Amino acid sequence: MIEVKRDDFFVESIKNPIEYGTYYKINSKYGTGFQWTSEVHHDFIITATDIRFNQETMVGEHIGSGYVLALYISGAGDEFYPYQNISPNTLRCYEPSEKYKAIYHPQIPLRCITVQVDQEFIDQYLQEISGDLEVNFSDFFKEKGKFYLPNVNHAMQSLYEYLLSMKASRITVEAKIYEIISYLASYLKENRLNEENGQPINKTDLQALAELTH
């Protein structure tokens, strides 16, 4: 097993085919692939990863200053804090400055997309679209298990594919971020109302949970 050293993980930037962001090629001693990252808007940062490791690889770091929503599109391995395996097509949440550690298995493509957003930006956007929408994103991002929300998963994967199409416009990417936040807000509002009214979990969530357990 090899542990990633941040000072040599990326060896060079790749010529960027779109107008913003940076593509980084990874060091061949770790594997093949790249990572694209961009502060598309000053309130959120997007990272798209497509890497195939040569051997068992450990990655340890701390999450940045914002809340992070991640979608594993493909990949295999184990995350710590808490311990759980990495499953394709599942979402994960990370809080600001949270400790992150994972071991990725070799020769299985690690494809994922993360969106880091600022709490103030989320609050401001929610106020604009619905002044009375009471949702608590900070509690949502305390969720430490992997989960599946159909609309959010689809929007995140669509954004990943759009970014890798090399035709992604900044305006469209921003619109997709707002779409993802709106889906999350709707989900949180629906579940808050269900709790207040004593309603059971909805059929969509039951199906999602069933898919995770099989």
PLM segments and residue spans:
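Alpha-helical structural motif
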Residues: 2, 10, 45, 65, ...
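Solvent-exposed loop/turn segments connecting transmembrane beta-strands
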Residues: 168-170
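A short mid-domain helix/strand-loop element embedded in enzyme catalytic domains
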Residues: 122-123, 130-139, 145-158
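A short, Lys/Arg-enriched amphipathic alpha-helix from helix-turn-helix/homeodomain DNA-binding modules
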Residues: 148-164, 174-188, 193-214
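Short Lys/Arg-enriched alpha/beta "domain-start" segment
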Residues: 1-22, 26
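N-terminal regulatory/effector-sensing and dimerization cores
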Residues: 23-135
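Generic structural signal of hydrophobic/aromatic residues within well-ordered alpha-helices
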Residues: 5-14, 122-126, 137, 159-163
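Hydrophobic transmembrane alpha-helix bundles
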Residues: 1, 96-105, 119-122, 176-178, ...
